[in-house]
């Protein structure tokens, strides 16, 4: 018989830097999960990734207080900011452009995020990433 799911907890945690302080501690402590056990498992799973990169994670908490978790790819906005070399997107993306990304960079980001995105082909995923870039005030160059 399958375990009974008590809750799903969605967080963004820096790769390799999970610790019991907020946001991890309160979110998991509320569900009665062993926080240090999660932190060790998460840090072990994300040690190959760039340290500090925000990683979305979905934690499934079961009635017996055990848990499983699934890590996703970093948000497109974070990857675009890194590729363009900017701190943050534009406050007025239709008027102020803050940086540039090439189509090759967009393709690379789309390939990185392919598992977490909908869309049949890499081209449709690239269009989605390019749209995110434009809404952040980045210019997509051919």
Swiss-Prot record:
A single Gene Ontology CC term: cytosolic large ribosomal subunit
One GO term (biological process): translation
Pfam families according to UniProt: Ribosomal_L11 (PF00298), Ribosomal_L11_N (PF03946)
Keyword terms of this UniProt record: Methylation, Ribonucleoprotein, Ribosomal protein, RNA-binding, rRNA-binding
Family matches, as CDD domains: Ribosomal_L11
Gene3D superfamilies from the UniProt entry: Ribosomal protein L11, C-terminal domain, Ribosomal protein L11/L12, N-terminal domain
Organism lineage string: Bacteria, Pseudomonadati, Pseudomonadota, Gammaproteobacteria, Pasteurellales
PTM annotation: One or more lysine residues are methylated.
Family (UniProt): Belongs to the universal ribosomal protein uL11 family.
Primary role: Forms part of the ribosomal stalk which helps the ribosome interact with GTP-bound translation factors.
Gene designation per UniProt: rplK
Official protein name in the record: Large ribosomal subunit protein uL11
């Amino acid at each position: 018989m399958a375990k009974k799911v008590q809750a799903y907890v969605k967080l963004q945690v820096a790769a390799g830097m999970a610790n019991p302080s907020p946001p991890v501690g309160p979110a998991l402590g509320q569900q009665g999960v062993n926080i240090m056990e999660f932190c060790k498992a998460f840090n072990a799973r994300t040690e190959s990734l760039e340290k500090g990169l925000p990683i979305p994670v979905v934690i499934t908490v079961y009635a017996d207080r055990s848990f499983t978790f699934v890590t996703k790819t970093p948000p497109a906005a974070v990857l675009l900011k890194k590729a363009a070399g900017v701190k943050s997107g534009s406050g007025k993306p239709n008027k102020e452009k803050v940086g540039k990304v090439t189509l090759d960079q967009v393709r690379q980001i789309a390939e990185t995020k392919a598992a977490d995105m909908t869309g049949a082909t890499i081209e449709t995923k690239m269009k989605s990433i390019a749209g995110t870039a434009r809404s952040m005030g980045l210019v997509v160059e051919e």
